[in-house]
Amino acid sequence: AAPELPITMRTLDVGGDKPLPYFPINEENPFLGWRGIRLTLDHPEIFLVQVRAMLRASVGLSNLQIMLPMISTVSEVQESKRLINQAFYEISDEIAESGETLHKPKLGIMLEVPSVLYQLPQLAKHVDFFSVGSNDLTQYLLAVDRNNTRVAGLYNSYHPAVLGALYDVVQKANQNQVPVTICGEIAGEPAGALLLMGMGYRRLSMNGFNLRKINWLIRKVTLDECKQLLSLALTSVSQEEVFVHLNQYLETKGLGGLIRAGA
């Protein structure tokens, strides 16, 4: 459908708040349990079937990117690469007589688990891109289950510690020359988009409903203004103070109503 554009496909990402009705996983703490890459590496037959399907669909094209969810160690990336290479060579052999070409896909990982924030240089040696999963990263950094009504009020992507972590990620990614994208609620919110632009993120993944609003907003501000706003946010002591700075700035730009409605 889009042979000239990169197509990113994520390997099976279930568990936690993404259950499969035909593959029930009963755990006392599912968010810290058997989910994402942990599950599929324990079941390489599932991983290989999915990767083979991705590769089959990409025969004759060169735009496939495979993304691994819930990575927490370098060894998980290494084992995933081994299995992807196995599938690649299997499919290559199967189509050898057809004259068709199979290109090796680019490989990326989701940055959702805090441990990987401290191993980005090591991980950069094994992958082609990073993608920050801000929703899960926020709940792990703040130790908050966002689906638990008793503590959901503590979940906030504008917590200064979360903003600091997101800033560190893009700085380290740039230092290691690895492209980085970010997805999650904050990327599709006007206030969040401004802060992320100030940090250095240039690829924001969001719901299609938010695209026009965010596109319109970023045309109304400069990068220098985003950086100044970020500086105030990073030195704040709470998310409430962050929002005070955001609202004050945006009111001066005549954009306060937009942010209050979308933040």
PLM region spans:
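Conserved alpha/beta-domain cores
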Residues: 1-263
